[in-house]
Amino acid sequence: MNSQAELRRRLGTQATFLVVAALLASFPLRAEAQESGTTESTETAVVENNLSAPRATERARSVPIRIGYFRAHDARGLNVFEAPKDEGMPYDGFSLQWGAAFTQQFQSIEHENEASPNVVNNVDLNSLIGIGKGFNNADANLFMDAQLARGIRVALTSYLSSRHHSETWVKDGYLLIDGSPWENESLDNLMKYLTLRLGHFEINYGDMHFRRTDNGQALFNPLVGNLLMDAFTTEIGGEVYARTRGFLAMAAVTGGEVRGQVIKPEQRSPSVIGKLGYDGQIAPDLRVRLTGSVYKTSKSISNTLYTGSRAGSRYYYVVEAPNATEAAQAWSGDVRPGFGKKVTAWVVNPFIKYRGLELFGNVEEAKGRSATEVSDRTWKHYAGEAVYRFFGNQLYVAGRYNVAKGQLQGISPEVTVNRIQPGGGWFLTQNLMAKAEYVQQKYEDFPVTDIRSKAKFEGAVIEAVVSF
């Protein structure tokens, strides 16, 4: 009965999303007084960053962007990191824009391990649950963006359906200030370089979170899965950016946890986040970006820097016990170091784009501990990714190598997890793509009493994405 009720809830959620998406696609957001100017800037972005003209130009006219300083939810947002310091279109009063993203995967993965038996109530909890070929739960996001005043907008993202939650719930919501709403020359000159973000938002630690899959929004990830150590979370606080001539500096202070709390203040402290970088077009065909980020929390009851993805991983039930459930074991295949009490982390991310070739790297180290530990543990995390886009950027091939090495709580020797992901994709339109990957992941140096001892999973995952 419970499984039938769960199935009904999920089918209901997906049906609701499809109805909402259809309504939003036909909803008249505002008058088209600015359409000619908007179309021109949008066409340029599409030709440079996404699909080839003239078909891309026709698509751009049908999906005008009415929000300033905005990263598009479709393929125009590819290789965009921080929201651009560019109004994009003249302010013409209050504007509201809705969007959505939807994904569906088909998984064909096998797994194995060599752990010693751990029998409880006649069940070996170190054996692996049986898995086969089939569809995963559909994921969906709903976006609401509003231009409140000149240079001021608000963003709200909700998860309509995810692996970890079948019900609708809010991911984040924040205010972004890129200009002064008042006619003041001094403020106008200052805001040419500054950006403020306030609210409950996805923190800007590293650059991978701009390329990762965010539940239903999978258009910016060239592959299906995210990194092993998925540095992604939302926290409440504020950010200040300074940008000029390609240089970027960011400082942020947040509450240090995924949700606000006022109890037990002696066990909590703010998180401090910093970022420095450069992003420039060195030559007509060459773009270079290099950033370094740091994140620090001295004490917390439940810090989620590496456990903040409330959507779950894309690899269902891999290396899980027979009693695993889709929601409770939602992060199958991820490496979660267990730094809930304190954590200090840094990451360097290089990005190079030369014509159709994109290279992206992740060099990271994190140190911290849980509430029950007295000494810190260290994890090192590396990733290299290559993408080559061709046929007017509509087709691409991609590959990623990822390795994480460190000490888990209760396991004395260091362990290593490595993953390879070759794949590719096809942008049918700027809003619709299909992609596939082969994934192989190995677990090394885990004790024989751990279910991950000499564990391995490999296979293929196919994913379809709609985003607008």
Locations of regions flagged by a protein language model:
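N-terminal periplasmic/intermembrane-space "pro-region" immediately following the signal or transit peptide
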Residues: 2-3, 7, 17, 27-105, ...
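Outer-membrane beta-barrel pore domains
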Residues: 2, 36-40, 44-46, 59-64, ...
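A broad helix-preferring feature
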Residues: 20-28, 385
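Histidine- and aromatic-enriched segments that form or immediately flank copper-ligand environments
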Residues: 118
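Outer membrane beta-barrel
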Residues: 85-115, 124-259, 265-299, 382-398, ...
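A broad, low-specificity signal for short, low-complexity segments enriched in glycine/proline
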Residues: 56-63, 135, 198-202, 209-213, ...
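Sec-dependent N-terminal signal peptides
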Residues: 10-21
